[in-house]
Amino acid sequence: MLAVPVRLKVGSRKPEWGTNRLTSCPAKDPLDRRLQNLRDRERVPEPQRSLRPGVQEDSREHGQVPEVSDPQVDLEFVDLQAKPRYRRLILKTQIPEASDSQAAQKPQAHRQIPETTEAGRETTSN
């Protein structure tokens, strides 16, 4: 018999599941890493994984109320009754007194008031 070295094709050996063919190192298995990350995350206690530094969880049902001591949050502009899915601050609309009289006249300008004639027919003024 001739001693001819047997040459295998690259990748002909069936690798085990989840191993990289080039390194075939089980430590580099991405699924294994993902499971390890999940295990590490479970080890972290809940209070350390908090929301934002200035926000504490509220016992009420509707969501988070910002802490009063947080200098960046102005409590006048925070809607405490907002549902938790609305994360951004809802600003209260501030209407100056001068535009109040104009706002009262605008709905009448948009709506056409039908004028009745002596005959009883309605005609709209254009």
Swiss-Prot record:
Superkingdom of source: Eukaryota
Start and end residues of each stretch annotated as Disordered: 15-72, 93-126
Ranges annotated as biased composition (Basic and acidic residues): 29-46, 55-64
Name by which UniProt lists this protein: Putative uncharacterized protein ZNF436-AS1
Species, as recorded: Homo sapiens
The encoding gene: ZNF436-AS1
